Every structure is written in structure tokens, then in C-alpha cells.
């Protein structure tokens, strides 16, 4: 599936120099490139994966060999420079700088440094690392070497112990749960049960770990599924390709680290947590590229964390479906804020990209989060989890603003505890000035038979698993574009679902529906829900509608004053045309301008000062610049 070109919202992209076409598949995203960040001041040490030596003094002319050994020598104020190349290590950082003299680990300017927790031979010597499997499937290979030290409990209960990527494109390899899936030629969803092996279903290039022989198996056979977003047609012999193969170790662990800065590094090569941070504080990651991993990032009991100008990529390949990941492989979250005490607090995730996975970001137990100017794109299940019990803490002081969300099956997600017990909730989550462009869906299901079609699931604004009590939501000054009718014709593109036992406020939002008109089903009169000043519009059917659009809603009992100042009108945005991918949500005048209602001044609003006169409706007030998200949209260093 090709993402829309949101040309007039400034989506910051990472540029890469022209290169030969990969032997595997075209990259899903621009590959990381070297940074031009200038050298810093203060004591400096160097490490080089090719020319380094453990017996050296760590100077620029005599660098050390490994990062893990080098970081143990660092003192407050030191900077460790990583020269270009791949460091096949699992690095543990357990050092502390000070507020005035932090410790910095970074790449040398102009050189791309990669910390790879994976297995070296599959990248550097693939011809000698793989052997054909006797009696196996066509194109099936296994590792020449045994890996008997992989921990059985490292799979997180999913039955997947190995993950990987094509090294030339970083397109993910499927982590197979079932041996029969790797070996079958069947590519249709005709298995007897979603999680029963049956005769198997091959879902794309991938890896599988054989616990009897302790060998890693790989198969890179082509896919030929009609109607799915893409198919694999690249090299099928793993001896001719470099593969990143991750097992049960992280690329980088921060253990009780403090006042540490990580800059301009690439982290990859793990089937568990690519980046793990535990019990740390005052940590900043800037310009980092992280490839999942299950998950890509895990952070527990850590305060004053910043992740800025960075990209985090998940494990979904172009041919990965929600079903293939959820039922026949691994279905990891991308980023997890662990909920065990002590509670993590005071985080900022800004100007980042979070892309290409099954589930996205779990932030349901943090105290103090500024999540802004990020791009969230291409998750075939849930995007941002705001309720995911069990948890030792509830969210507090969560601000999600000025983000762009696209191609997510469920943008905002809420889940019930496994034992279905009641979950506590926090004081409320603030979501404002975001753009949810949900016109494009995600890949849901593989066809069941040759006559069937691949199922592309429409993106939706919100949803839940079970019947949890949703976090209180303060949702205001957002712009939401949905492809079609909301579930049960709910008002606000489903934003009035799950209102029992919680609080919901919806003010000054634009809800646009491409096909049909927005829903009007509202909660009962006893729910603590207030909505007002919202603009609703149907792109195709709105212009021809006659009469009182809200008559149906007015005829049904609902909360007092619900939608009293809502409008049904063309929002008159700079560029929003049916069938065209480009998007510019700046107001042209009229429509959303001065049409909103007053929002409590104690609610945060990053663009309040730019909204002159009466409140405008939607993410951008009249005269505001384009929404800018992603790494290169960040303020200059």
C-alpha cells in the first residue's frame, strides 16, 4: 500500500543519497545517513569497529575496539565518538554524568555508526553461514551454526525467538511461529483456525528457530497474493544477501544511567527490546534510528527522558497484514512505557517518526508526557494506547499535540484487563491540534481463496478491546478525516464511544467524512460527555444536503447542551479535494474561522496565541503555518 503524499503538511523526510537498487526489495523508508552534527567540546574518546584495539588509549589515532568496553571508562563530561561501521555488540550503559557535565555517546560527524545486537555471520559472511535444508521446502536454508544459548523465555509468550531484516533495505523479515508456515507453498488464509498450524500459510520472507536443533531457518520465497499492498520478488538465496538476524539480546541497554546523551546512532538487530532503558534519569536520545525488536523501545521507571529528531521502525513488511502478524507471527508494540513502579515521569517525545508495525505506542502509565510534532504512520492494529491494564499507575499530565496520524487501523486504543477486572483511570488525557488523516486503510486479511480479495481495513479514530473504562479525554482543536461511516454511526467519528464511567470533552474539532455524512449517534443523557463547537462535513454528500442536518440528533435524548453550537458546513480548507492525496488544512476564511466556542484557559493549547478573535475550529487557526512533523522539522540544534 502506498502512503498518501501529504505534500502540503510538512512531513519531514530523511534524505538518502542515490544508491544501487537493493537485491531484496525497495526500502519502505529512507535509510539512515550520517549526521553532520559538529564535534563537541570537552574530553573525547574514540572507538572504531575496524581499526580499533582494546589495548589502545581511546584517542582519535588509537581508538578502542568495542563500545561496550569503552563506555565503562567514561566519566562526567566525556564524549565517546563512534566511527563509521557496524558494532556487533549488545552494549550496556550503566554510567552517570552530571547536570553540568553529561556523558555523550555519539557518531563521528559524517560517519554512520550502527550498533547491531544481531548475529554477525549473516551480515558479513552469508555464503558460509547458511546451508540448504535436506528435505525442507524449496529455498529453505538453515544456519550452519547452532545457537544453543537462546533463552526459551525470550519470546514474550509469542513463540517467536528470531526476527530480522534485509540489510540492504531494512525491510523486515517475518518471525514465524509455526514451522509449517515457513515451509508451505500455500499463500491463502484457508487454515482451520487463526492460531492453529493446520497445513500452514506462507506469509512472506522470514525466519524460524528450531528448538530441536537450535538452528535458525530462513526462507525468502516470493509472494504472489493478488490485491495485497505489495509482494516480494527479490533474491531468494540468503547466501547472496546480507541479513540482520536478531535474537535474545538488545542492541543497547541503559541500566541506572543518568545524565546521558545518545546522538546520531543506528540501533538494530534484536528479537527482544532493541533499546531498553531501566531505572534511569535525565536521558536524551537525539537523531537516533531504531529498528524493532519486540518492542523497538522499552522504558521502565525512568524520568526526564527525551526522544527527539529520531525514527523508530517496526516489524511490518510491505506484505505484512494484521492477521499474519497477530496470529501467525509476532505482533509487538513499537514503544512501551513500562507500568511497574516506580512510575516513569517527565518525558518528551518530539519531532519523531513512529512507523510500520502492528501496535504502536503505549503511554498509559506515565506522569508528565509532551508528545508533539511526531508522525505516526502504518500500524495495522492500534496506534496509541491510552488504557492498557494491568498497570501500577494511571496516566497524568499527558499532552498529545500537533502530530500527524495516518494509516492506523485504530488511532486511539483502550483495552480491558485479561481478567476483565475494573481498571482505574487518571484525571484525563489532553489531545489537541492534531491531524488524523485516516483516508487510507491498512492491510487486514489475506484472501481466503483464489477468488477472494485481500482485505484492506479502513482506518478509524478509536476503539477498544473488551469493555474497559476509557481514560477521560479532552479532545479539542483537532482535524479528523475519515473515509466512511463510523461504527454504529457514532458522532465525532466514534469519539463518543466508551463513555460509561468516564469523562469526555469534544470542542472545536473538524470531523470530515469522505463518503457519506458524519454520524450523529450520541451518548445517553446520564453520561459525562460534552461536545460543542465542532464542524461536521461530508465531502461527497455534504454539498447536496438540504434541511437541518442535526434534526435526527435533536430528536433523541442526549447530554444537556450537546452540540449546541455545532455546524454542518464546508470547512473551506486550503486544499482538501476528493481523490487527491495532497493536503493543506490551513483555513482559507469562512467555514471554521471564528466558529468555535471558548475552551477553558487552563487546558493546554500550543496555538492559543495564534488564534485571534473567537476560536477557530480545527487543528490550525487562520494565519498559522503548516503543521510540521518529523525529524527535520525540529528547531535547529
Annotated model-derived regions:
Residues 6-16:
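Bacterial N-terminal signal peptides
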Amino acid at each position: 500500500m502506498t502512503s498518501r503524499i501529504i505534500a502540503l503538511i510538512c512531513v519531514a523526510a530523511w534524505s538518502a543519497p542515490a544508491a544501487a537498487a537493493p537485491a531484496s526489495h525497495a526500502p519502505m523508508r529512507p535509510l539512515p545517513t550520517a549526521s553532520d552534527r559538529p564535534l563537541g567540546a570537552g574530553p573525547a574518546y574514540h572507538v572504531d569497529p575496524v581499526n580499533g584495539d582494546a589495548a589502545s588509549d581511546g584517542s582519535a589515532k588509537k581508538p578502542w575496539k568495542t563500545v561496550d568496553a569503552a563506555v565503562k571508562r567514561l566519566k562526567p563530561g566525556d564524549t565517546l565518538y563512534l566511527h563509521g561501521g557496524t558494532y556487533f555488540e549488545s552494549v550496556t550503559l550503566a554510567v552517570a554524568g552530571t547536570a553540568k557535565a553529561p556523558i555523550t555517546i555519539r557518531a563521528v560527524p559524517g560517519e554512520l555508526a550502527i550498533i547491531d545486537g544481531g548475529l554477525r555471520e549473516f551480515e558479513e559472511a552469508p555464503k558460509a553461514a547458511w546451508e540448504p535444508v535436506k528435505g525442507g521446502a524449496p529455498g529453505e536454508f538453515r544456519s550452519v551454526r547452532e545457537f544453543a544459548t537462546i533463552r526459551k523465555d525470550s519470546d514474550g509468550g509469542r513463540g517467536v525467538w528470531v526476527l530480522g531484516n534485509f540489510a540492504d533495505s531494512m525491510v523486515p523479515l517475518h518471525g514465524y511461529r509455526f514451522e509449517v508456515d515457513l515451509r508451505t507453498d500455500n499463500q491463502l488464509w484457508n487454515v482451520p483456525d487463526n492460531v492453529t498450524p493446520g497445513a500452514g500459510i506462507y506469509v512472506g520472507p522470514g525466519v524460524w528457530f528450531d528448538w530441536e536443533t537450535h538452528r535458525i531457518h530462513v526462507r525468502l520465497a516470493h509472494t504472489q497474493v493478488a490485491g495485497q499492498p505489495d509482494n516480494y520478488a527479490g533474491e531468494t538465496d540468503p547466501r547472496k544477501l546480507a541479513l540482520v538476524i536478531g535474537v535474545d539480546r538488545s542492541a543497547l541497554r541503559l541500566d541506572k544511567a543518568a545524565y546521558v546523551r545518545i546522538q546520531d546512532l543506528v540501533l538494530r538487530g534484536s528479537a527482544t527490546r532493541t533499546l531498553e532503558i531501566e531505572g534511569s534519569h535525565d536521558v536524551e536520545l537525539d537523531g537516533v534510528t531504531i529498528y524493532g525488536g519486540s518492542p523497538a523501545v522499552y522504558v521502565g521507571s525512568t524520568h526526564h527522558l527525551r526522544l527527539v529528531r529520531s525514527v523508530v521502525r517496526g516489524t511490518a513488511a510491505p506484505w505484512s497484514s494484521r492477521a499474519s502478524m497477530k496470529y501467525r507471527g509476532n505482533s509487538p508494540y513499537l514503544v512501551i512505557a513500562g507500568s511497574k513502579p516506580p512510575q516513569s515521569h517527565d518525558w518528551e517525545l518530539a519531532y519523531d517518526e513512529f512507523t510500520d508495525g502492528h501496535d504502536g505506542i503505549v503511554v498509559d502509565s506515565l506522569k508528565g508526557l509532551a508528545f508533539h510534532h511526531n508522525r505516526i504512520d502504518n500500524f495495522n492494529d492500534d496506534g496509541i494506547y491510552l488504557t492498557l491494564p494491568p498497570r501500577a499507575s494511571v496516566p497524568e499530565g499527558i499532552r498529545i499535540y500537533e502530530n500527524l496520524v495516518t494509516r492506523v487501523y485504530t488511532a486511539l486504543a483502550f483495552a480491558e484487563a485479561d481478567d476483565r477486572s475494573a481498571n482505574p483511570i487518571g484525571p484525563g488525557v489532553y489531545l489537541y491540534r492534531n491531524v488524523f488523516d485516516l483516508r487510507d486503510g491498512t492491510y487486514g486479511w489475506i484472501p481466503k481463496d483464489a477468488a477472494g480479495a485481500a482485505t484492506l481495513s479502513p482506518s478509524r479514530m478509536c476503539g477498544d478491546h473488551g469493555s474497559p473504562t476509557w481514560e477521560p479525554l479532552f479532545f479539542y482543536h483537532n482535524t479528523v478525516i475519515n473515509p466512511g461511516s463510523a461504527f454504529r454511526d457514532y458522532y465525532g467519528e466514534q469519539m463518543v464511544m466508551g463513555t460509561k464511567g468516564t469523562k469526555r470533552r469534544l470542542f472545536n474539532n473538524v470531523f470530515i467524512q469522505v463518503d457519506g455524512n458524519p454520524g450523529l449517534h450520541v451518548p445517553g443523557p446520564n453520561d459525562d460527555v460534552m461536545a460543542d463547537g465542532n464542524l461536521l462535513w461530508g465531502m461527497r454528500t455534504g454539498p447536496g444536503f438540504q434541511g437541518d442536518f442535526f434534526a435526527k440528533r435533536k430528536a433523541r435524548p442526549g447530554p444537556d447542551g450537546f452540540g449546541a453550537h455545532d455546524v454542518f458546513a464546508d470547512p473551506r480548507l486550503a486544499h482538501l479535494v476528493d481523490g487527491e492525496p495532497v493536503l493543506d488544512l490551513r483555513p482559507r476564511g469562512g467555514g471554521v474561522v471564528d466558529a468555535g466556542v471558548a475552551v477553558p484557559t487552563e487546558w493546554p493549547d500550543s496555538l492559543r496565541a495564534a488564534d485571534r478573535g473567537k476560536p477557530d475550529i480545527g487543528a490550525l487557526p487562520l494565519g498559522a503555518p503548516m503543521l510540521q512533523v518529523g525529524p527535520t522539522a525540529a528547531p535547529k540544534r
